């Protein structure tokens, strides 16, 4: 993992990305890193890499816990961020080493390739369980979406259970300072409205309001970044209409850009609708979600 394959010029990719304000994070196996940690990270630093995603640890014995500590420290010394994939749940390492951004430690979206267990009910259990421990690299963002009736396991072209609006809402609900896009670039090119919307959702928050929540069933949450608020709802396999009072807002008027389930989302899970409305902080709004659905909005104050 210190030498790229022939034809792959990583320093050139770093240069190309830098011109476009994009940094590169390299995925790496844990075992080679364990054996040559300093040597490998020195190479990555020299290339201009911004961070590493370490994978397949799959253990939590003392040796492995020490490995996490070594990686966090060595990466910090080289100003590299770290994402521990294939990991145990966080236990505070990100407080000691702020360059440690996030951890998997969860049955995430990637397992839709081989299971029906990653579904809207599962998604609504995680905020009350795994997320309590710290940042969670669930890897949301599926573009191929299916109802419970239409879902089938497809390892080559994975499909998510629940609606596309459900996937959009996960970026607000799930906390991870380094968020992932789970799907292929080709699929995002085919879904520009979805890609554009989730690209505008921050990954760090100044304030959070739990509006309503019931484990495994439904929730609505509001988060703040700068002057903007981000509102999201999730539901299980039951369609819901939830009234939300916007009294948590500070300014009097906001532009609310909504990404929600389309009229046919209960039978075609990829169906969505976007709309833009003006709202005030004393308003009561309705969040309508299809079965397995979701709802997300960006609220920008209007001067």
Residue ranges, per PLM feature:
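Aromatic- and carboxylate-enriched substrate-binding clefts and catalytic-loop regions
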Residues: 1-159, 163
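Glycan-recognition and catalytic regions of carbohydrate-active enzymes
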Residues: 183-230, 264-270
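Solvent-exposed beta-hairpin/edge-strand motifs
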Residues: 248-262
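Acidic/polar loop patches that form or flank catalytic/metal-binding clefts of enzymes
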Residues: 80-86, 110-113, 177-191, 205-209, ...
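Solvent-exposed beta-strand/loop surfaces of large extracellular or lumenal domains
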Residues: 55, 258-282
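C-terminal beta-strand-rich structural cap/linker in extracellular carbohydrate-active enzymes
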Residues: 276-303
């Amino acid at each position: 993992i210190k030498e790229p394959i022939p034809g792959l010029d990583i320093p050139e990719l770093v240069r190309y990305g830098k011109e476009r304000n994009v940094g590169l994070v390299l995925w790496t196996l844990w075992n080679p890193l364990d054996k040559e940690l300093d040597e490998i990270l020195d190479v990555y630093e020299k290339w201009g890499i911004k961070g590493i995603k370490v994978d397949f640890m799959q253990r939590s014995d003392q040796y492995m816990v020490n490995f996490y500590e070594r990686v966090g420290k060595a990466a910090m010394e080289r100003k590299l961020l770290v994402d521990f994939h294939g990991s145990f749940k966080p236990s505070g390492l990100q407080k000691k080493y702020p360059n440690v951004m996030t951890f998997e430690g969860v049955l995430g979206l990637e397992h839709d390739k081989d299971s029906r267990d990653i579904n809207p009910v599962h998604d609504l259990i995680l905020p009350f369980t795994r997320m309590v421990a710290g940042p969670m690299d669930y890897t949301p963002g599926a573009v191929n979406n299916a109802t419970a009736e239409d879902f089938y396991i497809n390892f080559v072209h994975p499909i998510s259970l629940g609606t596309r609006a459900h996937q959009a809402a996960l970026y607000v609900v799930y906390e991870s300072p380094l968020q992932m896009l789970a799907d292929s670039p080709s699929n995002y090119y085919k879904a520009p409205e979805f890609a554009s919307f989730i690209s505008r959702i921050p990954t760090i928050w100044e304030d959070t309001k739990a509006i309503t929540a019931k484990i495994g069933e439904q929730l609505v949450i509001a988060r703040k970044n700068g002057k903007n608020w981000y509102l999201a709802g999730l539901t299980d396999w039951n369609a819901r209409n939830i009234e939300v009072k916007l009294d948590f807002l500070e300014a009097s008027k906001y532009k609310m850009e909504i990404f929600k389930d389309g009229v046919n989302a209960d039978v075609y899970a990829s169906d969505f609708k976007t709309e833009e409305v003006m709202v005030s902080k004393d308003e009561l709004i309705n969040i309508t979600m299809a079965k397995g659905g979701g709802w997300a909005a960006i609220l920008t104050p209007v001067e």
